[in-house]
């Protein structure tokens, strides 16, 4: 009889385990943006979202202002102490403004950021440093770098002392079905800026979370398609705000005709005209994704 009870108990526990996994959230919660439905949440220029998928909790970017980010985190009852890791898409302040608050709450959290000279504590490479410090004949002593005796390597501190960044220089899988997609901008004003996007493999295709899309959203889609040619949704900043109406319409139409994307939840630097175009092309598959909105991810 005792053996029978034990078997029944173990069978019951085995049935509970899959149910628990199935109940874990599969969603993106927008923490920081400049628009949204009326609520107690603050608005600000920048972007931040909490991504939850298959038991992982990932903070993607941290918005543009410390106080606004902190207030919204508290109002949304998000526990930063239980994050699995943080992804910083790129170096701009409207995506890193709340990082100090994250580190106050979770000082040892793993942070992924793009490898880039001068950012996140990354010094110039030795060849670059040598080029910067080359000697010039005839220069007076008071104008010589380091009194004419430069160090072998230049050092640059991070604005977040003691933080251990994991710096990414190529696209990589960081957890089963979770990928960091690295691209480089060739646009005027952000030339050679490195950017990371987060691709999530779902049963319906990739869900792609983007910060600001400086390299170009279609270039990011191309890079992400190495992990799955089926693209389900894009969430985040598409950087169409400074494009002409014609360019915006072309990109939005390409989402449908070239990339066969099913849904879009655009935010931040996408721009108001682009939002109108997304509404026209995607209809009820255009997910309004202002601050506080929750976007479901297929599981």
Describe the function of each predicted region:
Residues 6-15:
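Bacterial N-terminal signal peptides
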Residues 117-196, 287-298:
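Metallo-beta-lactamase
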Residues 51, 61, 73, 90, ...:
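Divalent metal-coordination and catalytic microenvironments
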Residues 19-23:
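Boundary at the C-terminal end of the N-terminal hydrophobic targeting segment
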Residues 37-38, 66-68, 93-97, 118-121, ...:
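Active-site environment of divalent metal-dependent phosphoester hydrolases
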Residues 27-76, 191-210:
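Conserved beta-strand hairpin/beta-sheet module of binuclear metal-dependent hydrolase folds
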Residues 110, 197, 203-294:
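Cap/insert and terminal regions of metallo-dependent hydrolase folds
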Residues 67-116, 225-235, 239:
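Active-site metal-binding motif and surrounding structural segment of the metallo-beta-lactamase
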